[in-house]
């Protein structure tokens, strides 16, 4: 029996500034090291990128095929999954499916992990007039959760419920600000 066996995982992060803010993959790797585990990672992350953008970005495809990844983490643009179900189905779902299917085609053993994000601190003011459910943090968070869980279920993938943990932490520790001043990106504490 191996006691203290080291775990080594290879993870590709595909997303945008929510991932590269505060060098999140390195933070996770450092956390793994505290347990003598190893996280080898790469990333295809560009500020503001949607799943559609990644589907048309050669670097994303190159990185998907560059390794036998244990996990590929897929994180959508922060607002898109909070839009109406019809809009998500038309503008986000097809590209989430294309990325998921491409990861599985490159290596059937890779587990796709959808990174369920958090709502903006006070909701999405820009899109509130056209879709009122996103006018508040709670409304936006509920829509994000619904969309990411639909991706997970539709594609038989996994989901990292980051936004669910974020909401719980926000409720338990309201004095700790998880957001940068833009009320969208994570502070160091948020990451």
Features from the language model and the residues they span:
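Alpha-helical cap/lid subdomain in secreted, periplasmic
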Residues: 63-188
